[in-house]
Design a protein with these regions (language model features):
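Active-site activation/catalytic loop segments of kinase-like enzymes and analogous catalytic loops
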Residues: 109, 281, 287-324, 340-363, ...
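ATP-dependent phospho-/nucleotidyl transfer catalytic cores
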Residues: 149-258, 366, 371-382
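Short, glycine/acidic-rich hinge or "gate" loops at secondary-structure transitions
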Residues: 128-132, 181-196, 326-333
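Glycine- and acidic
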Residues: 93-96, 152-157, 277, 293-301
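Flavin-dependent oxidoreductase catalytic core characteristic
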Residues: 149, 153-158, 246-249, 261-262, ...
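Short pocket-lining segment of the protein kinase catalytic domain that shapes the ATP-binding cleft
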Residues: 140-148
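Active-site acidic catalytic loop and adjacent metal/ATP-binding pocket
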Residues: 62-80, 238-287
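Conserved NTP-binding catalytic cores of kinases and kinase-like/nucleotidyltransferase enzymes
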Residues: 1-137, 245, 269-274
Length: 382
């Protein structure tokens, strides 16, 4: 096991929620780190007394802004009695990058406090933990979803109109599950960020500006970007700031949103149902952020031009059928919310690096086209 270097703790995480297992007195590993059986067994023993991992094999490693390891573990009798499976997925930030955001501690809290209260399908979590020193270090140990026999989504998969409609029914189930619920108020869940009220949201363009600049050097990206954006790339920053102000001023019921709602953050079960699997940007928010991001990103440009409004109406019907109340009318969603939230997708994908795991060029084409078709820039003062 490689030990991470020790460094002074920077206060990244302002929600100093006490760690769930106070018996763990050492910090979670960070920086470049490779777990082994001894480390995993010691960690899991905080929740499952007597558990030991006799051996552990790393089956697959995904390393981007988040580190995900599929592992095969041989547990002792205590582990088997606790129901721990052989195949697991460990997720944390051991990439050596992105240490200035709170996404890993937040995801751990989502799994510890909230996902079992959602009506939508989520991955089984066997362990979730975080440091409460402001460092935002977090770790989760999930089931290996490969064992469910489905497949992981990818941002460029062609789901088609029917596939997107099916996914929107699943998304409505997610949003309606804790719609306007007392469980997600600031008083009941002070650890839960409100959409567009935290730096990872409202400063996202500025945080990601380095990668936005890298894409601006790419001739393939420049070939599909609007000239007005290439002439003044800071337009995305100004427009996005106005989206932030618009959302903060809007008054409507809150729900739980995924926050980064594209096909690449889903797992498709054998029965076709979508499972929402990445909670690093989970929020108390309104559904239009998820809805716009998913539909514009999942549909081809021509599919969107012909079917977008009908799919939005379908989602709204599903949302109400699942129990949501005081839902704004379709015209307001279509004319006021969707065009503005396209800017969220534009700023997200202009900063995407393909080596993080999602192919950004088709997404940039789709969101840029939607921005022009729906007058998103104009609505946001650009």
């Amino acid at each position: 096991m490689s030990e991470p270097a020790t460094a002074p703790v920077s206060v990244i995480d302002r929600n100093l929620v006490p760690r769930p297992y106070p018996a763990r007195t050492t910090s979670l590993p960070h920086g470049r780190f490779t777990p082994d059986a001894q480390w995993l067994g010691s960690l899991m023993a905080y929740k499952y007394p007597g558990v030991e991992a006799k051996s552990m094999e790393v089956v697959q490693l995904f390393d981007s802004h988040t580190t995900k390891l599929r592992v095969a573990v041989d547990w002792n009798e205590a582990g088997l009695a606790a129901g721990l499976p052989r195949n697991l997925c460990i997720k944390s930030n051991w990439s050596g990058m992105f240490s200035d955001v709170d996404i890993h501690a937040l995801e751990a809290r989502f799994y510890h406090f909230l996902t079992d209260k959602l009506s939508a399908n989520t991955a089984t979590c066997y362990y979730a933990d975080w440091d409460d020193d402001g460092s935002a270090h977090g770790v989760i140990v999930l089931e290996d979803l490969i064992d469910r026999g489905g497949e992981f989504g990818h941002s460029t998969q062609h789901a088609g109109i029917d596939g997107v409609a099916s996914a929107l029914a699943d998304l409505a189930k997610l949003h309606a599950g804790l719609w306007d619920s007392p469980l997600i108020t600031a008083e009941a869940a002070p650890w839960l960020p409100t959409s567009m009220h935290v730096p990872v949201d409202h400063d996202q363009v500025r945080i990601m500006w380095h990668w936005i600049g890298e894409n601006l050097k790419d001739p393939n990206f420049r070939a599909i970007a609007p000239k007005h954006y290439l002439d003044d790339a800071r337009r995305v920053e100004r427009a996005y700031d106005r989206l932030v102000a618009f959302e903060r001023a809007f008054d409507a019921p809150y729900c739980i949103i995924l926050g980064d709602c594209h096909q690449g953050n889903t797992y498709i079960l054998p029965n076709g149902e979508r499972m929402w699997v990445d909670w690093q940007l989970g929020r108390r928010g309104r559904p239009w952020r998820d809805l716009t991001y998913f539909t514009v990103g999942s549909l081809t440009i021509e599919e969107r031009r012909h079917h977008h409004r009908d799919l939005i109406a379908h989602y709204r019907d599903c949302l109400i059928r699942e129990g949501a109340t005081n839902v704004i009318d379709l015209d307001t969603i279509w004319n006021e919310q969707i065009p503005r939230w396209v800017m969220y997708g534009i700023q997200a994908w202009v900063a995407n690096m393909d080596h993080w795991g999602q192919n950004g060029l088709p997404m940039n084409e789709r969101f840029f086209a939607a921005g022009e078709d729906l007058s998103s820039w104009k609505l946001l003062g650009e």
